[in-house]
Amino acid sequence: LLSSVVLSGSAILFAGTEEQKQTLLPQIVSGEKRIALACDEGFHHQPTAISATAAKEGDTFLLNGSKARVIDGLSADLFIVAVRTAGNAGDTNGISLLLLDASTPGISIEKTSLVDSRNYARLTFNNVCIPASHLLGEMHNGFAALDKALDRGRICLAAEMFGGIQEIFDRTVQYLKERKQFGVLIGTFQALQHRT
């Protein structure tokens, strides 16, 4: 949840209008709304490889395509979807960020079978209509905000992993101080001392 809040919240912070920031950021921070960033289409380490499209038609966008692995996608109320509005996959220009309510008709949300606790989902979009007012930042220029948000997300993910490892280490040390084998604390065994 933390990395999802940081990723999505950062995208809103970097690209959102003042109204979007004032409305959404307090809801995200308070936990009132759960939000997820949807940009991965299977090229996990290349965020410019976006091929999901959003064609502007009047005052709406028509969204089609899919997202392969969306962290916290199963529990999200709202998505920030990175889409191609111009150019070709691989270009940094032509990427836009759109806010999408999870209950919008035409969106399919499926659980993915990854061994992780992050509620990964696969999203499929079939002619999903999104109001033009749900554009984050400027049309075709969403990559700069996306890139900054991903940088913050990487730092957050590293902090989460470090915290988890520290907890495992602390519990292991505690166990070594409490568990006895052959009438002796196992923490006194030389082989286990080498590992801690």
Each predicted region: which residue ranges?
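A structural signal for short hydrophobic beta-strand segments in well-ordered beta-sheet cores
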Residues: 52-55
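Internal helix-loop-helix
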Residues: 1-31, 71-78
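A short core secondary-structure module
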Residues: 64-108
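Buried hydrophobic positions in well-ordered alpha/beta secondary-structure cores of metabolic enzymes
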Residues: 17, 37, 63-65, 81, ...
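Short Gly/Pro-enriched turn/cap motifs at secondary-structure boundaries
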Residues: 42-45, 69-72, 88-89, 112-119
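A short, Trp-centered hydrophobic/proline-enriched beta-strand micro-motif
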Residues: 31-42
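Glycine-rich beta->alpha junctions and the first turn(s) of the following alpha-helix
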Residues: 107-195
